[in-house]
Amino acid sequence: MRPQQAPVSGKVFIQRDYSSGTRCQFQTKFPAELENRIDRQQFEETVRTLNNLYAEAEKLGGQSYLEGCLACLTAYTIFLCMETHYEKVLKKVSKYIQEQNEKIYAPQGLLLTDPIERGLRVIEITIYEDRGMSSGR
């Protein structure tokens, strides 16, 4: 997934956006460090999609209510044999990030880190040195 043997030249951190409360969402402001590396609309679309997925994970509905009831009735042992709605959506997030890295970010010398690996505090984007510059071409 990581660009092969390219040294890290920096990291960018996309902070959480608390303007709408404490729900998990990240700022869509385009960081200057990514200028000339990735299209602004593509970056914003990635962050918006992640925000929508996290909103879906936190949404309370019939399934979440049923999971809670089953958990209470089984002394939470039900979670040994089934995934919660939240866990299923987190898997979707991981898959989406992996796809974005493969299709969009890695070819540009960038790597998105799953926010769950940073405690849902930030989206970390690692910037690798431009291969063309490092190989002397």
Swiss-Prot record:
This is Golgin subfamily A member 7. GO terms for biological process: Golgi to plasma membrane protein transport; Golgi to plasma membrane transport; peptidyl-L-cysteine S-palmitoylation; protein stabilization; protein targeting to membrane. Its main location: Golgi. PANTHER family: GOLGI AUTOANTIGEN, GOLGIN SUBFAMILY A, 7, GOLGIN SUBFAMILY A MEMBER 7. A lipid is attached at C69, C72 (S-palmitoyl cysteine). Expressed in all tissues except colon and thymus. May be involved in protein transport from Golgi to cell surface. The ZDHHC9-GOLGA7 complex is a palmitoyltransferase specific for HRAS and NRAS. Palmitoylated on Cys-69 and Cys-72; which is required for Golgi localization and interaction with GOLGA3. It comes from Homo sapiens (Human). The gene is GOLGA7. Pfam families: Erf4. Changing C24A: Slightly reduces palmitoylation. Transmembrane segments: none annotated.
